[in-house]
Amino acid sequence: LILAGWASNNKWSLYGGMRSAAQIVSYEIPAGLSIVVVIMLSSTLSMQGIVKYQEGGIFNWIIFTNPFAFVAFFIYFISAMAETNRTPFDIPEAESELVGGFHTEYSGMRFAFFFLSEYANMFVVSGVAATGFLGGWQSPIPGYFNTPLWGIFWMLSKTMFLVFMMIWMRWTFPRLRVDQLMNVCWKVLLPISLVNIFGVGIWTLVFG
């Protein structure tokens, strides 16, 4: 992103690329710590193992197993929105400040690739959230609708629901300022993520 902004030979593009890089690096940390919660609860790094851990219906999904898991999901979802530059976290391409951000000077297929990559990123982070917190391809009803075809349906449904939530939040919330964006990450999400990991550890020791 920095190279895309720098190569445009435009100050607005360079500012947008630098903002985007700083934002992604910052929000990777709380997102990663939220995934650590999933790994601690499922005791595996395998995504297939994580989904298998959640079989048995909707109340076995990690998001509903304990309050710390719900907090981890919320933090991951907010961080994922920030990483994909979705409103209210679209500071790198704020029209009122940077014209169009790092893709100001791009048009045609180059702009289309930037545009498509943003939506592809939304689907990827939503798929990871569905796998880690919402049971992946597992049916919400124990013992029913668990065939491979139904698994594809459940996985796509959960992913599309999270994508819809991202788009809905874009329509609903105003854009944050740069200082507010960084304060949310370093002063709110990161401390809560660290405390949340300790909470999950204690929960696991007490309740198994």
Each language-model region and where it sits:
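Selective transmembrane helix interface/packing segments
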Residues: 1-208
